C-alpha cells in the first residue's frame, strides 16, 4: 500500500507550511487526484487519520478533487478524456495516445484556524 508513504509525504509538506506560517491548526485539506494516479482515496483517508494524530492536522478533513485524465490522440489529432492507462481513443479507437494529465496527486488547498 503505497498510500502510506504518500500520506506521510502529504503530512510532512503540510507540517512544513504550518511551521513557516506559524499555523497551529489545520481544519481541511483539498487534494487533486487523477484517475491514473493509482491512488485509492479511502486508503489515503485511513492513513491520514492514523498519521495525523497528535499533529496540527488531527481531526482535519480530507477532500478529494477529481482531475480528468487527458490524452492526445496521434491518429485523430484530438485531446480526449481517458479512464485508464490502456484506453483507446474514444473518438476514433486509436491506440497511440500521449497522456497529458490524470496521474497527479497534489495538495490544492489547506484551510487553517
UniProtKB/Swiss-Prot annotation:
Binding site for Zn(2+): 73, 76, 89, 92
Annotated Ni(2+) binding sites: 2
The keyword Cell inner membrane is assigned to this record: no
GO molecular function ontology, one term from the record: nickel cation binding
InterPro entries linked to this entry: Hydgase_Ni_incorp_HypA/HybF_CS (IPR020538), HypA/HybF (IPR000688)
A GO biological-process term: protein maturation
Chain ranges passing through the membrane: none
Pfam families with a match to the protein in the record: HypA
Keywords, ordered alphabetically: Metal-binding, Nickel, Zinc
Protein family (similarity comment): Belongs to the HypA/HybF family.
PANTHER family recorded: HYDROGENASE MATURATION FACTOR HYPA (PTHR34535:SF3)
Purpose: Involved in the maturation of [NiFe] hydrogenases. Required for nickel insertion into the metal center of the hydrogenase.
Protein name: Hydrogenase maturation factor HypA
Organism: Actinobacillus succinogenes (strain ATCC 55618 / DSM 22257 / CCUG 43843 / 130Z)
Amino acid at each position: 500500500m503505497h498510500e502510506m508513504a504518500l500520506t506521510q509525504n502529504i503530512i510532512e509538506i503540510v507540517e512544513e507550511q504550518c511551521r513557516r506560517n506559524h499555523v497551529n491548526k489545520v481544519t481541511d485539506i483539498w487534494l487533486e487526484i487523477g484517475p491514473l494516479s493509482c491512488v485509492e482515496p479511502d486508503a489515503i483517508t485511513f492513513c491520514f487519520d492514523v498519521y495525523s494524530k497528535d499533529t496540527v492536522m488531527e481531526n482535519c478533513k480530507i477532500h478529494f478533487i477529481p482531475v480528468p485524465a487527458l490524452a492526445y490522440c496521434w491518429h485523430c489529432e484530438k485531446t480526449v478524456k481517458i479512464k485508464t492507462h490502456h484506453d483507446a481513443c474514444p473518438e476514433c479507437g486509436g491506440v497511440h495516445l500521449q497522456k497529458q494529465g490524470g496521474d497527479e496527486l497534489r495538495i490544492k488547498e489547506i484551510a487553517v484556524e
